[in-house]
Amino acid sequence: MSVTRADREASLKKRYAGRVAAAPKRRGMGRGPGPGAPRGGGRPKSTGAALKRLMSYLEADRLRMGIAFFCVIVNTVATLTGSYMLRPIINRFIAPPDGSPGNVAGLFKGLTMMACVYLLGVIANYLQSRLMLEVAQSALVRIRTDLFTKMQKLPVRFYDTNSNGDLMSRFTNDVDTIGNMLSSTLVQLFSGTLSIIGTLFLMLYTNIWLTAVTLIMIPLMLRAGGEVAKRSQKYFSAQQSALGALNGYIEETITGQKVVKVFCHEEIAEEEFDILNRDLREKQIRAQFLGGMMGPVMNNLSQVNYSLTACIGGILCVVKNFDVGGLTVFLNFSRQFSRPINEISMQVSNVFSALAGAERVFSVMDEEPEAADDKDAVSMDGMRGEVVLDHVTFGYNPDKIILKDISLYARPGQKIAFVGSTGAGKTTITNLINRFYDIQSGTIAIDGVDICHIKRDDLRRHIAMVLQDTHLFTGTVMENIRYGRLDATDEEVVQAAKMASAHSFIMRLPKGYDTVLESDGANLSQGQRQLLNIARAAVSKAPILILDEATSSVDTRTEKHIEQGMDRLMAERTTFVIAHRLSTVRNANAIMVLENGEIIERGDHEDLLKEKGRYYRLYTGMAELN
């Protein structure tokens, strides 16, 4: 049955629902909790709370902000003073009310003074712009730091249920939107308010009746602005949500580009991208259209107001109840009075975009961090590597149990293997040993101490992992290996590489250990990346080792090479092996066969073959394929 565009659109909406708060990854039972209900998308925080919290990041720069806002006051006063100076210049030197001739020398002197006043305003405006830019960037540094620091404290569960692309969108798009508001919008709101107050005072001083005419339109302008702001807020939140969904899809597609090409999924990917892209376009149009309506509406009302004021002012001049200089200045003030109102109204879209972005950033900051260590948690130095699981029961969701009554005992230096079908719970067990998740019942103990009573850093410092999905950081080969133990010497790094059988290929690289790796080690083969991962585990000197299908993604020849490194790595370490190829676990001290979250068989290779149970069928089936 063919899949229609409507079907794909429905699928995308389901997959990316609630992207504003979370973006579930599709992961199996053995790899993580899998898709969960969207969190927080339908209950955004209040605008006032987001604004108050955002302003707290400016408190450290109160002095610079104070100077900047003082400069705003100077600029506003200079602008208003310069504008009002036109009245005496016109009435005294250009068109005196008594009909006497003008005065060129006086005109030149008056214009020079007015230019000096405006120059003072220009200097103040430059200082204000520079200072607010520094304040905004300092605030962004603090926001990014808090966001990144918080993300280091979040549990693995958070990353299992959130899209990398959406999280990156919060770091980039949302934070940049906040920066734009802090650097310019705040000042424009303050200067606009100040201009309105100052202009209104001078308008009243110039002519109270024309001021009354000008103010007639203000309630209508405020009502229009409030209505547009009210309607546009929800659309700006939807826009940020759609942007996060699109970024998440792009990140997933680029990361999985090989899979896309292998399954000839290019056209489908383009179609799904088009659906998300068009959805973003529609939401952006709605948000930007409503936000952009503010300017034209205000301008039209301002033009009507200007025309009405000019007509009435002209009549007053004709009947000699007003002077030409006063009318000129007042018309200029009426423009200045409506301009900040227009500017403030046009900043509404920026404000709501920034607040929507702030809500998304703060939603990550407000996530529950990894549970703190118990008060009686102990430090463990020199672990021997004795691991005991006693009647462990666990589920990523309490109502869906994955591991049922798991018990096992590993003596220091033993090799324990887990085999079973995909989704049986093999990786979940290793996640629990690392305490990436807390169990529902039972105990996990290392060297006789419940891991809940061991400080997390100490626990994980004594456990090294080599995963199927290798990950290398941008940097030198030396730095990537040393990531396993930052205080390792160069000699220890080289020794670890030799133990992992990686030294020979490293020395063939252009700069040896100083060769800079591209993102995720893209300039190395899969096997070479895995050897560096093994070297990283070796340099850590951890007494407990976890190998999660470490050779399943390489060819047989490379696998033999990697196995040599792993054999040396496993010596004198308690090792837990998740096996894809059963030939790699034949020499394990104990093999645990898992099915549906339960250990259905256990024993060494020979004993399990004699039982002719599940392991026997798996092994002989593999042998026949080979």
Regions flagged by a language model, labelled:
Residues 156-157, 173-182, 186, 190, ...:
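An intracellular "coupling" helix at the cytosolic face of ABC transporter transmembrane type-1 domains
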Residues 47, 65-127, 204-209, 320-324:
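Transmembrane helix-loop-helix hairpins at lipid-water interfaces of multipass membrane proteins
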Residues 96-103, 109, 202-219, 286-359, ...:
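Helix-loop-helix
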